[in-house]
């Protein structure tokens, strides 16, 4: 081995030791989901109130709930899309078992005409802090 190869090997070893181990593959990836809902237009205001309470509580008390964005179509406000990001699958499962989520499901049961859940993989996510 020549001096150049030894220097490269030494630098690589130093960088590896300073950076620490690479993230383990066995760690769970974030759980990302999109929910598409159709709400009974006559109950839209009540639905939004229940959803607001659920989202605000989940963000405040569940460390594994990272993002919950609820939007409606401009020309059809009864069509709701929720973009959800959880720390991992366990955080998503814990969210489903939380008291506030169960309350939301019970409260909105007769308001939701259809629900479609779409599992997603994050490709590019960007945001600015407010």
Stretches with model-predicted labels:
Residues 30-38, 67-96:
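Short, well-ordered beta-strand segments in beta-rich or mixed alpha/beta enzyme
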Residues 45-47, 78-80, 127:
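Short acidic, gly/pro-rich beta-turn/loop elements at beta-sheet edges
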Residues 7, 26, 52-67, 85-119:
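An amphipathic, aromatic/His-enriched active-site/gating alpha helix that lines ligand/cofactor pockets
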Residues 1-3:
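N-terminal secretory signal peptides that target proteins for export/translocation
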Residues 5-10, 14-31, 69-76, 105-130:
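Glycine-rich beta-strand-turn "strand-cap" elements at beta-sheet edges
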Residues 31-61:
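N-terminal targeting signals for Sec/Tat export/insertion, comprising classic cleavable signal peptides
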């Amino acid at each position: 081995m020549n001096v150049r190869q030894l220097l490269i090997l030494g630098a690589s070893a130093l960088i590896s030791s300073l950076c620490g181990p690479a993230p383990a593959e066995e760690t769970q990836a974030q759980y990302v989901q999109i929910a598409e809902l159709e709400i009974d237009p006559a109950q839209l205001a009540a639905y939004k109130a229940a959803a607001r309470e659920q989202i605000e509580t989940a963000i405040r008390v569940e460390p594994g709930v990272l993002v919950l964005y609820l939007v409606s179509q401009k020309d059809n406000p009864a069509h709701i899309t929720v973009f959800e990001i959880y720390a991992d699958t366990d955080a998503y499962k814990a969210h489903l078992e939380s008291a506030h989520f169960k309350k939301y499901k019970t409260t909105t049961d007769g308001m939701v005409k259809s629900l479609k859940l779409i599992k997603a993989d994050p490709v590019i996510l960007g945001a600015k802090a407010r």
